[in-house]
Amino acid sequence: MAAAAAATFLPHTPTPRRRLAVAVHSPTRRRLSLVFSGPPDGALSVAAAEEKADAGEEAAAAVSAPRGGGGGGGKERRRVVRKAWEKLVRWSRSWRRRNRSDVVETTRKVVVLGGGSFGTAMAAQVAAKKADLEVSMLLRDDLVCRSINHSHINCKYLRDHRLPENITATTSASDALAGADFCFHAVPVQFSSSFLEGISTHVDPKLPFISLSKGLELNTLRTMSQIIPQALGNPRQPFIVLSGPSFAIELMNKLPTAMVVASKDKKLAAAVQQLLASPNLRISTSNDVTGVEIAGALKNVLAIAAGIVEGMHLGNNCMAALVAQGCSEIRWLATKMGAKPTTLSGLSGSGDIMLTCFVNLSRNRNVGLRLGSGEKLDEIMNSMNQVAEGVSTAGAVIALAQKYHVKMPVLTAVARIIDNELTPKKAVMELMNLPQVEEV
């Protein structure tokens, strides 16, 4: 279990995988084939090649060891597990040496658009990479600017955390964007188009935009990969999306986190991976921009549904059934739009869904919880100082589902509750009364 858990945080290699089959003969004379996956032969270090040679011998020892917790068999299994772990660590170190990049060394300035909790956390994450890296936050609030520049604290979000001194804030787009090597976009989706149009004259056409915003534009059904180039008037604007299970507060506390960057430009994704990766943040890469964006948008709506179930005290059985159904609905729509199924079971899919649906730090889950407890949506939204993207995304999701002819009963119910056309209690009754069908 330790090895499996640790594998989540080991470096990701974008190179093709090689499969090595080892035939092992057990004492019962039944032939067992074990398959090992690794980098292509050209990427193997000498140490890895040597380790490959005795893999069959150790596998045979593990298979032939007597069952049970005691005796020599237990010691042998522990020895095999220990050696496997040591090999994993050696491979990790070797991979890091081979894949060192000068991205961090050559990056002089990064700009962050937006001063919310996640934009602030990402600014701190990047600023910690090296002391002479200039990180400029473009904000609209003069008070927050002064707080960051004078006290190194965002007085509005994450107030208990001091920011690195190489982070500065400004309300001037020209000052913030001048000479930037990378741009992190952390403005809520519904405000992104107008915001970007306002700063477009200051944006270098080759400046890579890394989107942190999750959701769909309500009236147009556009994702950020469509909004950014269109708002900037540059269809070739380099674009990357960053997503995955991550709360800003835990990033600030340097707790272990894993995320994914997706871009159609493989080299650009690898560059952003190197820019962000740290001992507490593991970054994987993907070329499935559609899958990462759609999963990130739809999980917010599902989180509202999960919160409603919690607020109504409907129990764990109901919660599990609802989230499972919601995951299926997300898969149906995303794959129709061209997403890869593997993306939906990865960090930006299942990982982000689990975090957002089951953890109280989730804004969207808390909106649902309060709706399920009987509060009115207007009261809930007026009491929040941050945006819950799932509220505005819900209607767009259903319009998108109709466009692609996909039935989404759970997410449709959320949209109707938000529009005040259905009470949570009535929604549950109608969902439970749907026809008993074959699971797909």
From Swiss-Prot:
Q: What family does the database annotate?
A: Belongs to the NAD-dependent glycerol-3-phosphate dehydrogenase family.
Molecular-function GO term, any one:
NAD binding
Tell me which UniProt keywords the record has, alphabetically: Chloroplast, Lipid biosynthesis, Lipid metabolism, NAD, Oxidoreductase, Phospholipid biosynthesis, Phospholipid metabolism, Plastid, Transit peptide
Q: Name one GO cellular component term.
A: cytosol
GO terms classed as biological process: carbohydrate metabolic process; glycerol-3-phosphate catabolic process; glycerol-3-phosphate metabolic process; glycerophospholipid metabolic process; phospholipid biosynthetic process
- Listed EC numbers: 1.1.1.8
Q: Which Gene3D superfamilies match?
A: N-(1-d-carboxylethyl)-l-norvaline Dehydrogenase, domain 2, NAD(P)-binding Rossmann-like Domain
Give, as in the UniProt entry, the pathway in which the protein acts. Answer: Membrane lipid metabolism; glycerophospholipid metabolism
| Family annotation (InterPro entries) | 6-PGluconate_DH-like_C_sf, 6PGD_dom2, G3P_DH_NAD-dep, G3P_DH_NAD-dep_C, G3P_DH_NAD-dep_N, NAD(P)-bd_dom_sf
Q: Where is the transit peptide?
A: 1-47
Q: List the NCBIfam families hit by this protein, alphabetically.
A: PRK00094.1-2 (NF000940), PRK00094.1-4 (NF000942)
Residue numbers binding substrate: K214, R363, N364
Q: What SUPFAM superfamilies does the record point to?
A: 6-phosphogluconate dehydrogenase C-terminal domain-like, NAD(P)-binding Rossmann-fold domains
Which cell locations does it reside in?
A: Plastid, Chloroplast
Instruction: Name residues in a coiled coil.
Output: none
Its UniProt entry gives the catalysed reaction(s) as:
sn-glycerol 3-phosphate + NAD(+) = dihydroxyacetone phosphate + NADH + H(+)
Q: Where, by residue number, is the active site?
A: K299 (proton acceptor)
Q: Where is this region: Disordered?
A: 57-76
Residues recorded as binding NAD(+), renumbered to this chain, are: G114, G115, G116, S117, F118, G119, F191, K214, A248, R363, E389
The entry's protein name is Glycerol-3-phosphate dehydrogenase [NAD(+)], chloroplastic
Summarize the protein's role.
Required to supply glycerol-3-phosphate in the chloroplast for the synthesis of glycerolipids.
